[in-house]
From Swiss-Prot:
GO molecular function: rRNA binding; structural constituent of ribosome
Annotated PROSITE patterns: RIBOSOMAL_S19
Family: Belongs to the universal ribosomal protein uS19 family.
Organism: Paraburkholderia phymatum (strain DSM 17167 / CIP 108236 / LMG 21445 / STM815)
Stated name of the protein: Small ribosomal subunit protein uS19
Coiled-coil portions: none
Gene Ontology BP terms: ribosomal small subunit assembly; translation
A Pfam family that the UniProt record links to this protein: Ribosomal_S19
Regions that span the bilayer: none
């Protein structure tokens, strides 16, 4: 179920402070965050945000198409190594 429009998008306050500071200083260094639940706002466009995936911080460069999505959507948490090969098919 989607979030109510009257509530507006959710974004952690500490992340907003970091984004505002980076925008004011024109800093291109990635902003490190653990907040996968935060919605990407138009203020984030052009910034690189390092989103934690449970093991490391994955750099995510924010573009216009990402606005409205969550940060966690762009930092995958699972690594798929492939299914076991079928031994009968190899013969």
């Amino acid at each position: 179920m989607a979030r109510s429009i009257k509530k507006g998008p959710f974004c952690d306050a500490h992340l907003l402070k970091k984004v505002e500071a980076a925008a004011a200083s024109r800093d291109k260094k990635p902003i490190k965050t653990w907040s996968r639940r935060s919605t990407i706002l138009p203020d984030f466009i052009g910034l690189t945000i390092a989103v934690h995936n449970g093991r490391q911080h994955v750099p995510v460069y924010v573009t216009e198409n990402m606005v409205g999505h969550k940060l966690g959507e762009f930092a995958l948490t699972r690594t798929f190594k492939g299914h076991a090969a079928d031994k009968k098919a190899k013969k």
